[in-house]
Amino acid sequence: MADLENGRGSGAGEKDPKLSDENTDAAPATPTSRPRGLLARLRLFETHMDRKLGIESDAIERKRAEDRQHVPWHEQLSMALLWASGTMNTSCFATGFLGREFGLDLRQTLLITILVSLLGGAVVGAAATFGAATGLRQMSVSRFSFGWWPNKVVAVLNAIQQLGWAAVSCITGGLALTAVSDGRVSLAVGIVILAVVAWLISVVGLNAILVYERYAWVIFFVIFMIMFGETGRYADNTTPATATGANLAGGVLSLIAVVYGSSASWATVASDYYVHYHADVSRVKVFLLTTLGIAIPTSIGMVAGCVVSSALNVRPDWETAYQKGLGYVIQESLYPRGFAKFLLTLLVLSGINTNVIGIYSAALSFQQISRPFSLVPRFLWMLLSLAGILALALGGREQLNQYLQSFLSLLGYWCTSYIVIILEEHYIFRKGDFASYDLDGWNTPSRLPHGIGASVAFGLGVVAWCMGMSQTWFVGPLARLIGDSGGDVANEFTFVVTAVAYPPARYLERKHFGK
């Protein structure tokens, strides 16, 4: 830890203009590569706004240990509350309906939802421990295993992931807004409103996000407790699963993939929200608060969806409302009607919480795709992120269930490979010691691994995804063996393949190149 506080972790070399000669794409924003013209004026404006509002004009720079302060214990609760606000939302509620779609009964769906949410939360908790210890954002952390060039692919995937997940939240929130207005506000308009409000909050920066998310969860926790109280009596725990045999196994595996993808997908942004904590903050505390901050709120939202979806078997009026849209079934299941509209109006805001995180982290990922991209002000990347979210949400707004099944599963696939590589690098090759990281060289290609081992393991992981995935548009050869519609085993197979492939590939890379 001493290295983090002083020597190698000091960050003194981060703005050193002396770069390796292999590094044309990568010149930092130093005197050798300053933005010019309009870009320079925009960066100047961003710096001015940073001084006034703290919008983080240097968001992707490493936060050095001496620049960070100890955070009071009550503010450290944000490690959990941030995620509580981002996950207790209508998207998780909608995901709770998928167990019924896969032919599972209520008991099976609840068990999978709770246990797999905990597993996914643990994955995020493990990733989060790198933030305070290194002072680096998640996409910068992964440079120490993926290397400079392969990590660009990871940054692109992460940006797409954040935009896609935010689009899901816009769709579910827009559906709720449409129901509240009795159809007077179209789904498209609702999507635009949610995306723009989230963008405005995200622009201000991490400090505003942490304050907003620290308290926003309370509203949605109360709403879901009311929902449990009013709908729990209709939960149908007697109707058996409609799927049997191999089809039941396939449904179980597919639901596991969706729930895991929903929870674990935050692993690729986790460190983004911990860089302001002091380097000596307890990593056990970080892990536990993050894990529970993901698992419990995710379970609350999804379990509420499980309960209401099971009640469709005994409440045909709810089934009719569900066919009209997600917001209508929420409104129909709560009473009195005026109170239901009020709660639904508040629940619309839950989509903003997820979007705030998605837009903020997507902009950070875009800035790390290449050095020229890093010179573009963060607020412009956030504007482009807003446009991407609107395009995805408006394009997929009529196919929510298919969007959820396909997109959330895909999130889990690549996040599994990512976290396995990050953790094996840390615990096998660096012996769990953050002092072994050349943190000053985080932005210098010649001081980073080449990423050959990670590329090989990640590439084999992609093959494993394709063999084990079960999507509406493609069913892999392994998945096809399980049930009529296939059973998604992509995460499990990807985990095994990546975990086995990375150590020997990385060993050979280190032996040949010495880093």
Regions picked out by a protein language model, each given a short descriptive name:
Residues A188-I193, I352, V356, Q368-N401, ...:
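Loop-to-transmembrane helix boundary motifs in multi-pass membrane proteins
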Residues A2-L106, G250-I256, H276-K285:
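Membrane-interface "cap" regions at the ends of multi-pass membrane proteins
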Residues A155-N158, S181-V204, V218-F228, S262-A270, ...:
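Transmembrane alpha-helical segments of multi-pass small-molecule transport proteins
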